Amino acid sequence: MKDILFFYGLECPHCVIVEKHVDKLISEGINIKKVEVWNNKENDEMMMELDKGDDMCGGVPFFLNQNTGKTICGEATYKEIKNWAQGK
């Protein structure tokens, strides 16, 4: 099973809020890989490569489920992220 990717920026205020939800979900056993893009050119290039098509976010926070191809763009609640990660 592939990771769910969480793209974020260290200084992004929306990302700080969402990252708290991500950390809780990781502690509950949900497989999420955190990928910082504002200070890492390689990670930013990876996000740009993956953030394409009709569901394009164009920024952070950005979630990509590599198994389903589904995304979440922008600030989301803990419940929204958990339900999405579990395919609900």
In which residue ranges do the predicted regions lie?
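Residue-level recognition of beta-strand->loop/alpha-helix junctions
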Residues: 34-38
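Disulfide-bonded cysteines in secreted/extracellular proteins and peptides
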Residues: 12-15, 57, 73
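N-terminal beta-loop-helix "entrance" segment that forms/cooperates
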Residues: 40-50
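Structural micro-motif
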Residues: 48-64
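Local sequence-structure signature of Cys/Sec-based thiol-disulfide redox active-site neighborhoods
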Residues: 1-33
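Short alpha-helical
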Residues: 13-14, 41-42, 79
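Generic recognition of short, well-ordered alpha-helical segments
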Residues: 16-20, 45, 76
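Non-catalytic, surface beta->alpha helical segment in thiol-disulfide oxidoreductase systems
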Residues: 59, 64-88
